[in-house]
């Protein structure tokens, strides 16, 4: 089958590298891809959020399966776009629906989802410009470090962990009032800091059954010794000893 992988990062390169080993793959395309993917697939210039362009590529290249790497097109509803288009509805697309993508696209949505279904999570509250003074009071009720999370997507950089209360209040205003992360931080989730190891659990599902993949740990900090701001992720290890 002909496969289209959307994205331009190391994640997409790793996905294409694995797909290229399968006997089921004929030609693999990457949109837009990168230097590494060009060695394994055919790169196509374009924006992963240009759904009409993606449709054109899928039709012209006789694509049977689309794998969506980045979060942005998922949150904007690329799965729904395919399923509602008669020319694309039978193309296999590996991505969640727009509603399911809200778990990644909105931290406030995710927190409310966890509360509704009794999934353990840190103590938290969501604030906007309208109730920012209440946010100050909530911060004062907590012990450091203080965790501020932009509600929307921010390329992995929207979470701040701060030790100082005054700095936390300052950064809160920078996020909400000054739009430090654009529209993504017009709403901010303040939550309790949890000590421990962060792990990612991956599950593939078709809506009827599911298959779990190995756990992994991200190393997101940009600086040496796990310091500095978060990135989308520098590297990731599969972990068995946890």
Region annotations inferred by a language model:
Residues 1-96:
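ATP-binding N-terminal substructure of ATP-dependent carboxylate-amine bond-forming enzymes
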Residues 12, 51-54, 75, 79, ...:
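A general structural signal for well-ordered alpha-helical segments in protein cores
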Residues 38-41, 102-108, 223-225:
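Short, charged, surface-exposed secondary-structure boundary motifs
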Residues 43-49, 125-131, 162:
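Short acidic-hydrophobic, aromatic-tinged amphipathic segments that line or gate anion-handling sites
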Residues 57, 137-138, 171:
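CheY-like receiver
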Residues 88-158:
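A conserved helix-loop-beta module that forms one wall/lid of the active-site cleft
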Residues 162-242:
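Internal nucleotide-binding/catalytic subdomain
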């Amino acid at each position: 089958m002909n496969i289209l992988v959307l994205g331009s990062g190391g994640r997409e390169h790793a996905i294409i590298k694995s797909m290229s080993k399968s006997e089921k793959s004929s030609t693999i395309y990457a949109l837009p891809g990168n230097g590494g993917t060009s060695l394994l697939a055919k790169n196509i210039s374009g924006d992963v959020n240009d759904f009409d362009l993606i449709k054109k590529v899928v039709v012209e290249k006789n694509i049977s399966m689309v794998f969506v790497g980045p979060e942005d097109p998922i949150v904007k509803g690329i799965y729904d776009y395919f399923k509602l288009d008669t020319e694309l509805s039978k193309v296999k697309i590996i991505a969640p629906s727009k509603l399911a993508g809200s778990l990644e696209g909105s931290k406030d949505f995710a927190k409310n989802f966890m509360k509704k279904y009794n999934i353990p999570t840190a103590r938290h509250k969501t604030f906007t410009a309208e109730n920012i003074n209440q946010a100050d009071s909530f911060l004062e009720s907590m012990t450091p470090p203080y965790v501020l999370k932009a509600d929307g997507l921010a390329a992995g950089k929207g979470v701040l962990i701060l030790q100082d209360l005054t700095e936390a209040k300052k950064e809160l205003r920078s996020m909400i009032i000054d739009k430090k992360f654009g529209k993504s931080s017009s709403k901010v989730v303040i939550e309790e800091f949890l000590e421990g190891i962060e792990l990612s659990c991956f599950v593939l599902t078709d809506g009827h059954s599911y298959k779990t993949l190995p756990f992994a740990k991200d190393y997101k900090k940009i600086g040496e010794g796990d310091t500095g701001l978060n990135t989308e992720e520098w590297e990731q290890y599969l972990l068995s000893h946890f």
